[in-house]
């Protein structure tokens, strides 16, 4: 099916770009003054509507509704044609299997199967198939800064238990187990080992990234998933518009952001904004790059691939104005968390958020994409940052050519999609405007005993004094007033030092769960560089350490040139596992310990970890503060938390000049520049090389290149589905539903997980019996999610949820009654009997049928069971669309009526005739075997849905188009 012809009704808007490229584009800004006040995100929706307006799937009325967004928001549904689709392997399998099956159907109908291709660019990332079978579970030694391999940290061994693990964000392997091995059975030995084994948490310890481990895991991955990988490789060969990113390359969201994003699309010399929908939960991240995108279900992405739009309610758009300048000591993490916290408090659920104002230019692309990625935290559909100069600078660093960037900028400015701080005229109008003054976001620390006790850095000195005075409790230490100024002298390494209340004795820079943003680690390194150059040092008795979360952190600290300066201040790399923050601290010197005991001093530990409970770092260190990495370095240099950074110096330079924190604190611009040059560029180059080179196993993987896929009849993962078995060249007239039995009588809020569970396959289920009969053991069953490419498994798994409550049964169970025989059977077995007897089926349900996550098999499964219609009080809209898309009629009780009020038992048979001229919302009559007649609503909303239903669903509709 060809993509819709470019805006037949709006050809008069086509212009030629005023540059050397002479590309064409739709100048939507010529639609009038209404366009000028639209939010940027709505302008992207409008451009797509204009470009794809064909009078059927996209009507002129839809274009006008978007243009009139100000009055139509939240009231109308509009279609949207995204520029591209992003799939992961789990959701990609059923979509590509359907396309492969469609080729078979088109050939059967006498058409050319080679015409069957996705209608838009489709990228499929294989990043959900890796399981960790081999790992190393000891704390790793630091790499040699001068080069050389990592020292081996543990014995490579296959794990005894191999649960399915999804890849962790931003890496191709999951962090390993913290299990240190089989403990001895002797109780004394067991107790001793517990006391002496480092406590490792799964968020911090990673498998050793040595070739031996990676290669062994990849070898198992390719063996375990060979069928699927061969199918994906065949798909990438025969389908135009399909690109497969092989396993071992990276995470879907990382690849989408750093490699697949175009910002501006070019197709047949026509320019238009990049946009994307996909099944990756991190899809919203690209909005930070000025690319409109959000997550949808598998069936929606497949619909887009088949040439149909996604549908959305025209959203409210909350304008978030960023003003002021951030406090010089504020880090990127402070800003990101401050903004997301504010959005959560305001309430933006189900809305678009769009950022504007002078403060936006202070946010790096990393900041923006992080905020955009945190949409689930505050409930927004997406958070959009229009393209600006910061975006272009980032794209320059990630490989875009100068000519491409110039063309991009010219186009975006021509259609008023480029944000310019210097030109505030014609600012968009928003549903609501909220203001966040970046000055209001202040740097803070947490402590001295609990993570939730936040203290602004400006209040640190007074707060610590208050803690000394307060009674012993969550914050207090109850130190007598006359002892609060006590000083104890110590001799250490030939010099004399003085300790007092507030003295820092432990300082640890840790890149872990809450400080993995590169900018804060680089800020710590840049601060260390400036401190060393100013002649500042950390007192030698302070236990300093640097624990990167991964080798990547070490790489960019080294490549940016700041690692030697951290080392100069004593922040040497100690390892890559949990250490300081779980209490695995090197012991303090005897001199310090004796001084603390002698003066009963409240000394301090300061770290950039996530736990600071009293005594956690060391029994004798009573005050522990969590801080950003640069603040850890700053307090270590100061040697005390009892300091006001605004008025008191950190120390003096060799000439005796006072050096204050503001003298050595790196600016955000400086940090962003180094981040772009030494992190973003490095990561992009590594990713690009990986994708373009592939890997040996993928490159050598044999796969067919035939027009039709050679289905393996023995395969339990990939089968040619039966959706097209009865497909005819032309759609036949709508058939009456005669004497249909009720397969299931369900209540309210039946979810898609009740209908099509995605979890493990129960050993006593119909799917398990099918797999067992094909020689598989229970350990080899895998999950329903992994077998989405096998319709036989998925059909047997339909309504197989053990929590399904069928009123015929009276208790939760995946069972029903086969009424002709009176038997209680598995749902699949009953449906199979009905089909053999030629009896059509319907489902009775209550309110919100099909709620929960979008799931394609929640519609496909019932269809293959023989369900012709669902009769419910109300539907989750997305699921109702799915039912129509597969050819099941969504019928709805009249308002105020339901099965109970009509006296239906579900044991009757039901008959229904469709009129020749079916129209949206038409009322139909159902007659039961008891003689009762009642009216229902055929819940079709427009002519497109009726057309799809008459064709027997979306797949049949498209197959006929191709044939």
Curated annotation (Swiss-Prot):
Modification note: Ubiquitinated and degraded by the proteasome in presence of high level of iron and oxygen. Ubiquitinated by a SCF complex containing FBXL5. Upon iron and oxygen depletion FBXL5 is degraded, preventing ubiquitination and allowing its RNA-binding activity.
Segments traversing the membrane: none
Note on how the cofactor is bound: Binds 1 [4Fe-4S] cluster per subunit. [4Fe-4S]-binding affects RNA-binding activity, thereby inhibiting activity of the protein.
Pfam name, any one: Aconitase
Gene3D superfamilies in the cross-refs: 6.10.190.10, Aconitase, domain 3 (3.30.499.10), Aconitase, domain 4 (3.20.19.10)
Keywords: 4Fe-4S, Cytoplasm, Disease variant, Iron, Iron-sulfur, Metal-binding, Neurodegeneration, RNA-binding, Ubl conjugation
Origin: domain of life: Eukaryota
Residues reported in the UniProt entry to bind [4Fe-4S] cluster: 512, 578, 581
InterPro entries given in the database record: AcnA_IRP_Swivel, Acnase/IPM_dHydase_lsu_aba_1/3, Acoase/IPM_deHydtase_lsu_aba, Aconitase/3IPM_dehydase_swvl, Aconitase/IRP2, Aconitase_4Fe-4S_BS, Aconitase_4Fe-4S_dom, AconitaseA/IPMdHydase_ssu_swvl
Primary site of residence: cytoplasm
GO terms under cellular component: cytoplasm; cytosol
Places the protein is found: Cytoplasm
Names of required cofactors: [4Fe-4S] cluster
A Gene Ontology BP annotation from the UniProt entry: post-embryonic development
Gene Ontology MF, one: metal ion binding
Physiological role: RNA-binding protein that binds to iron-responsive elements (IRES), which are stem-loop structures found in the 5'-UTR of ferritin, and delta aminolevulinic acid synthase mRNAs, and in the 3'-UTR of transferrin receptor mRNA. Binding to the IRE element in ferritin results in the repression of its mRNA translation. Binding of the protein to the transferrin receptor mRNA inhibits the degradation of this otherwise rapidly degraded mRNA.
Similarity annotation: Belongs to the aconitase/IPM isomerase family.
PANTHER family referenced in this protein's UniProt entry, alphabetically: ACONITASE/IRON-RESPONSIVE ELEMENT FAMILY MEMBER
Disease as annotated in the protein's UniProt record: Neurodegeneration, early-onset, with choreoathetoid movements and microcytic anemia: An autosomal recessive disorder characterized by severe neurological and extra-neurological manifestations. Clinical features include early-onset global developmental delay, absent speech, dystonia, spasticity, choreoathetoid movement disorder, seizures, and microcytic hypochromic anaemia unresponsive to iron supplementation.
UniProt subunit comment: Interacts with RBCK1 isoform 1 and isoform 2 only in iron-rich conditions. Interacts (when associated with the 4Fe-4S) with FBXL5. Interacts with CIAO1 and CIAO2A.
Protein's name according to its UniProt entry: Iron-responsive element-binding protein 2
Native source organism of the sequence: Homo sapiens (Human)
Protein encoded by which gene: IREB2
